[in-house]
Design a protein with these regions (language model features):
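Polybasic, glycine- and aromatic-enriched phosphate-binding surface used to engage nucleic acids
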Residues: 1-81
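Non-catalytic DNA-recognition/assembly elements of restriction-modification systems
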Residues: 67-129
């Protein structure tokens, strides 16, 4: 499964791209670890044999994130808390929590992004992307 990892003051993809955020590291961690971001990476990454998804630096640089100015203070705090829990405990249900909060600021509903992500991931793993 795709995910970003938090290591002290930097965020790194599991293939070791280092991201130095200009915002709170846990908030950035939340923006990276949600179904909306995963969908973009599935769409833009290159597929290789056995369903391998190769991500390049420009795939990360071209990610579209929601405008954080549209989030209220409570939502930002919830994103940070869920992100901390994901980082500390590895509880992947926190990805759902993060995605649901972000869905409040997206034209794409939560259920639609989950369905679209599942479908594109399934096609990639079958070698049909």
């Amino acid at each position: 499964d795709m995910k970003f990892i938090l290591n002290e003051s930097v965020l790194a993809r599991d293939n070791f791209y280092i991201i130095k955020p200009k915002i709170d590291k846990y908030l950035m961690f939340a923006l990276l670890n949600n179904y909306y971001t995963y969908y973009q990476l599935e769409k833009n990454g290159k597929t290789y044999g056995a369903g391998l998804l190769k991500l390049q630096r420009y795939d990360i640089e071209n990610l579209m994130f929601p405008n954080l100015d549209e989030f209220n203070e409570e939502e930002v705090e919830q994103l940070i808390l869920a992100s901390r829990n994901l980082s500390k405990y590895g509880d992947e249900s926190e990805i759902q929590t993060i995605s649901k909060i972000i869905s409040n600021h997206s034209a794409v509903e939560y259920s639609s992004i989950v369905e679209s992500l599942d479908r594109i991931k399934e096609l990639r793993l079958k070698g049909e992307k």
